[in-house]
Regions:
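Sec-dependent signal peptide recognition
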Residues: 1-8
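N-terminal signal peptide c-region/cleavage motif recognized by signal peptidases
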Residues: 13-15
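Soluble small-group transferase modules, centered on the S-adenosyl donor enzyme superfamily
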Residues: 19-41, 45-47, 214-297
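Intrinsically disordered, low-complexity coil segments
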Residues: 47-55, 145-152, 271-273
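C-terminal substrate-binding/active-site "lid" region of AdoMet-derived donor-dependent transferases
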Residues: 177-240
Length: 297
């Protein structure tokens, strides 16, 4: 718990005494890069509030700052040696950089609708691109539709296009999840960064369940995010997860990822659904995601 409190304190303190080192208005938002001591953060200035999208420690860029980013690596308890990775939503490129270091032979495609975000990630957050790592300016749903037409498949699909102020509603519908499922390789997994404390929770859960069946929530205390892990065929055994924890612990510890704690934060929805059976599924015709998220409770 102390780690989570310390992270929150660092971010709060940094925000209060930050220097703006870059500012621009893109086609989609106001973009800021702020520095406070050792911490550098990418922020979107929206609705009279700054929301942090990505942060790094300048002295140790590989050490992850945000808890939700760390939660994403619970995926590795479900899949082994991913070789084709799709990330929708770039931020500062943190996830891409870490995955590339862990799996240097993997092909990683980063899809980001805002070209200014990609440039900021390159210029200020050491986002790495090479023959294995690419970025593309495109709407995430359009990319997935075209990937499906090309019969492309991915072992690990990470949906990270949401923030606390705005949700692209077309990326949170049954139809979109069906499109995502169509490009998911056998034995692959979808990891979605989402919320655990708003009225959207039940609708989102019902929608994932309608497409993928039972899924796993990864939540740790003192954290307002959850990671949904979906698309797997069978739940790993306790023994299998323990073996993966042992294997992954030394690989992930340099990034400040406590994989054992993440394994304890996993809970399956099998015989454990925490939303009403009559919860309305989000569709292209019905997706008031931002209104539901605003009315948190």
């Amino acid at each position: 718990m102390f780690k989570y409190l310390l992270s929150a304190l660092l971010l709060t303190t940094a925000s209060a005494h930050a220097d703006v080192i870059h500012q621009e208005r893109s086609l989609y938002r106001n973009i800021l890069v702020e520095e406070s001591g050792d911490l550098r953060c990418l922020k979107f200035d929206e609705k009279a509030r700054k929301s942090s999208q990505s942060c790094m420690f300048k002295s140790n860029p590989q050490k992850l700052v945000f808890n939700y980013t760390k939660l994403t690596f619970a995926s590795l308890l479900m899949i082994d040696n991913p070789q084709n990775v799709l990330i929708i939503g770039l931020g500062g490129g943190t996830l891409s950089n870490v995955i590339h270091e862990l799996y240097p032979t993997a092909n990683i495609e980063n899809i980001e609708i805002d070209p200014a975000v990609i440039k900021v990630a390159r210029d200020y957050f050491y986002f790495k691109e090479n023959e294995k790592v690419s970025s593309k300016v495109q709407d995430g749903r359009i990319f997935v539709k075209r990937a499906a037409l090309k019969k492309q498949q991915y072992d690990w699909i990470i949906l990270d296009a949401f923030n606390g102020d705005y949700i692209p509603e077309h990326l949170l519908t049954k139809e979109f999840f069906e499109e995502v499922k169509s490009v998911l390789a056998p034995n692959g997994i979808v990891a979605a960064n989402t919320f655990s404390s708003s009225k959207l929770y039940e609708h989102e859960s019902a929608t994932y369940h309608a497409v993928f069946g039972d899924f796993i929530n990864v939540v740790t205390e003192k954290n307002s995010n959850r990671i949904i892990l979906a698309g797997f065929d069978t739940m790993p055994t306790t023994q299998s997860i323990a073996a993966r924890v042992k294997k992954l612990r030394p690989l992930l510890s340099p990034y400040d990822v406590d994989i054992e704690a993440l394994s304890r934060g996993m809970s399956s929805t099998e015989n454990n659904q925490d939303w009403p059976k009559d919860t309305k599924v989000l569709t292209d015709q019905y997706s008031p995601a931002n209104l539901l998220n605003l009315n948190s409770g």
